[in-house]
């Protein structure tokens, strides 16, 4: 029935007292349908029997600080009224009195007469009608006076709009559209000037249609261009301050050296990088948020705004955080549906798993078989995974294991931007040259990532040699803690992040509340390395003795060095007296950990010549290591010399003072109280490390015990599917090897 009524864009909106349908067309004219015939009822004023001449006229406003100023006044001030009328094609004429005006016009009284303006030009009407807010003042002004800026100060005075607001209007006209916004507006075929946008915005008020507030097609996901936004905003602020103060022409544009930096660090969306694992590395670039500079207030984002919108499909994945920021912070899919580099969303045409699910879910076999709420926990668990020596490439794969390295930063993988060849390889770095002549490099060997206040040691390796050629997108170096060369394609790098175990699914005291038990053998397989950094601050004049060496194995009670205070030999003490005094004055910091000394760095504020000989020797050795690593990876060569901006635990390093950082790497096998992840997302706490052996009926050793109830209660099938598939693949592999050897 509606299809028959709603022809030529009209819409049904009610019925008469006789039950006759009423429709409204695109021109806001109402019709009743009588026996298939459309009978005009007029506009809304006619239907409601209201005098349209006396009815208020709609007009658009623009907010400047705390005041709302009609768009017509702003446009008139910036362009002149005649130009505004011409641009909007507004028809107007002079009349003797209001009675001569039809319902299609409204009037404004000026000093030189009464002028009628056409209401049927809806955009022009909304702009010009704003002048009615100043009708008392306009009676003393001629129409042509509004072509001059000075006249508008009289209008502004009526509404107590001071020069501060006027200058803001002028600056907004100059600075509102930045270069990035201009390019986007051009792509959208929209106006690229402030005045043009005011007119376009008024035009969009012509109807009541508007996109949903959560419609992603009406938004942009901005990346590092936000940094340019901070810079532009601070520059604009400085220019505004300059123009507001520049009364006598002697002021200067003043931008503080830390203004931009302070604006960035005050942004509430800022987060420290966590170099803990390659998936977390991806997540930090896939994360999107509604808060931050230019964003929304988290407290104002209610349930409706946190729901998943249809337009999110193909851009925003299932992954979000498990806190009060749920859906305020979310993660993009592994291949979001962007139409350009500015983060604009297009129409989704091809639906595939990488385009819908997050990187975490794409790495989780059978995750689509799990309860939807539990799939999100794959992403959550991936933020806390650390490297273990027993990791291997998964037997059951999704295929995304090959993509991770190509998306990672240099801490985890170094991928070729173009084809080229290797220039040099040392134990501390690799340098390559692309076909376009550009050189790049990455540090090899031990590097340290930071996450949540801890240091995590990573080992960057390469299989390439000097003068070897490579292809575009080939992984040139990778983190061996998380990646290995693929056995099928030696040029491909596959992610390794799993350890397969024979798990007995049973209920016992060890599986209460999702806990688990593991064998001693399996515990030793899961050895994780962490690095403890000992910081020692000393003065240049102090001597150091018996300093530990790089590569040395130390115990918790071993001394890292002996520091002698400045008791100076110029006092003429004999050798025995000096030894007594030195023994009283010396400091000897302890290691506090059992591990291996992997690196010693010295950062100093001052000149090497001012140091004691022992400290200078240590600093020179540190500088040599730092410089060699930088040179070997095509980086600018630096040393440990710093200034007073360098801080040790938040305190600036004083002049003629040095910080010695000793990196001690510790091995930690999985033990009671440690957390593990069963299958994709089943977090468990180790309740017992079994020093006895449990076997299956056919004699196979059990590596771990976990509760089947824990799996069943969470409606996840992936643990069962992964376990059975991996077991089957191992049997098939053994059969294949047996056939090959026979």
Q: What would you call each of these model-derived segments?
A:
Residues 7, 501, 510-512, 517-523, ...:
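Intein-associated homing endonuclease modules of the LAGLIDADG/DOD-type, together
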Residues 192-195, 199-322, 326-670, 674-675:
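Long, charge-dense accessory insertions within large macromolecular proteins
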Residues 9, 48, 52, 66, ...:
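Conserved NTP-handling cores and scaffolds of large molecular machines
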Residues 1-279, 283-285, 330-336, 340, ...:
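N-terminal non-catalytic structural scaffold regions of very large proteins
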Residues 165, 532-537, 737, 741:
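A generic structural motif
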Residues 647-742:
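Conserved phosphate-binding elements of NTP-dependent enzyme cores
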């Amino acid at each position: 029935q509606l299809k028959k009524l709603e022809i030529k864009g009209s819409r049904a909106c009610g019925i008469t007292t006789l039950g006759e349908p009423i429709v409204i067309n695109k021109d806001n004219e109402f019709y009743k349908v009588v026996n298939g015939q459309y009978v005009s009822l007029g506009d809304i004023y006619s239907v409601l029997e209201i005098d349209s001449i006396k009815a208020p006229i709609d007009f658009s406003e623009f907010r400047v600080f705390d005041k709302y100023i009609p768009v017509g006044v702003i446009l008139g001030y910036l362009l002149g009224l005649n130009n505004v009328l011409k641009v909007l094609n507004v028809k107007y004429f002079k009349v003797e009195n209001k009675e001569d005006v039809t319902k299609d016009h409204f009037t404004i009284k000026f000093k030189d007469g009464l002028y009628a303006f056409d209401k049927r030009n809806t955009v022009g009407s909304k702009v010009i009608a704003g002048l009615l807010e100043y009708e008392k003042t306009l009676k003393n002004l001629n129409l042509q006076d509004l072509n001059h800026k000075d006249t508008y100060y009289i209008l502004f005075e009526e509404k107590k709009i001071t020069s501060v607001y006027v200058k803001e209007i002028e600056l907004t006209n100059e600075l509102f559209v930045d270069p990035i916004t201009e390019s986007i507006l051009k792509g959208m075929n929209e106006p690229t000037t402030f005045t043009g946008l005011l007119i376009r915005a008024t035009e969009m008020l012509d109807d009541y249609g508007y996109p949903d507030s959560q419609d992603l097609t009406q938004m942009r996901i901005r990346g590092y261009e936000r940094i340019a936004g901070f810079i532009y905003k601070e520059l604009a602020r400085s220019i505004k301050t300059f123009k507001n103060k520049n009364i006598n022409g002697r002021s200067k544009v003043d931008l503080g050296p830390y203004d931009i930096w302070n604006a960035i660090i005050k942004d509430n969306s800022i987060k420290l990088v966590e170099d803990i694992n390659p998936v977390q590395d991806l997540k930090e670039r896939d994360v999107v948020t509604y808060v931050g500079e230019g964003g929304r207030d988290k407290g104002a984002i209610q349930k409706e705004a946190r729901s998943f919108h249809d337009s999110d499909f193909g851009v925003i994945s299932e992954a979000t955080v498990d806190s009060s920021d749920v859906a305020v912070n979310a993660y993009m899919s592994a291949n979001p549906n962007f139409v350009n580099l500015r983060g604009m969303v297009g129409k989704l045409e091809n639906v595939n798993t990488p385009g819908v699910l997050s990187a975490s879910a794409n790495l989780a076999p059978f995750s689509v078989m799990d309860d939807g709420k539990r799939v999100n926990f794959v992403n959550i668990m991936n933020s806390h995974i650390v490297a273990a020596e027993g990791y291997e490439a998964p037997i059951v794969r999704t295929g995304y294991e090959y993509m991770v390295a190509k998306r990672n930063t240099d801490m985890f993988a170094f991928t070729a931007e173009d084809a080229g060849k290797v220039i040099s390889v040392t134990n501390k770095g690799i340098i390559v040259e692309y076909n376009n002549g550009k050189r790049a490099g990455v540090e090899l060997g031990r590097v340290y990532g930071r996450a949540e206040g801890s240091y995590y040691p990573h080992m960057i390796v390469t299989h390439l040699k000097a003068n070897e050629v490579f292809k575009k997108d080939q992984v040139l170096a990778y983190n061996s803690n998380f990646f290995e060369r693929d056995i099928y394609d030696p040029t491909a790098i596959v992610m390794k992040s799993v350890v397969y175990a024979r798990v007995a699914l049973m209920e016992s005291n060890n599986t209460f509340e999702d806990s688990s038990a593991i064998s001693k053998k399996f515990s030793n397989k899961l050895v994780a390395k962490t690095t403890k950094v000992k910081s020692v601050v000393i003065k240049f004049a102090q001597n150091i003795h018996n300093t530990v060496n790089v590569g040395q194995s130390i115990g918790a009670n071993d001394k890292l060095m002996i520091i002698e205070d400045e008791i100076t030999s110029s006092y003429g003490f004999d050798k025995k007296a000096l030894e007594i005094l030195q023994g009283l004055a010396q400091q000897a910091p302890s290691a506090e950990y059992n591990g291996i000394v992997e690196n010693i760095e010295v950062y100093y504020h001052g000149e090497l010549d001012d140091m004691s000989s022992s400290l200078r020797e240590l600093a020179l050795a540190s500088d040599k290591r730092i410089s060699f690593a930088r040179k070997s990876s095509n980086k600018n060569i630096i040393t440990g010399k710093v200034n007073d901006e360098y801080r040790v635990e938040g305190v600036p390093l004083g002049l003629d003072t040095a910080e010695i950082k000793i990196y001690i790497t510790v091995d930690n096998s999985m033990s009671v109280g440690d957390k593990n992840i069963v299958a994709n997302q089943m977090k468990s706490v180790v309740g017992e490390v079994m020093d006895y052996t449990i076997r299956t009926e056919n004699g196979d050793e059990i590596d771990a015990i976990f509760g089947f109830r824990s799996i069943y209660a969470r409606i996840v099938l992936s643990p069962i599917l992964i376990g059975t598939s991996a077991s089957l693949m191992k049997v098939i592999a053994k059969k294949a090897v047996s056939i090959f050897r026979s």
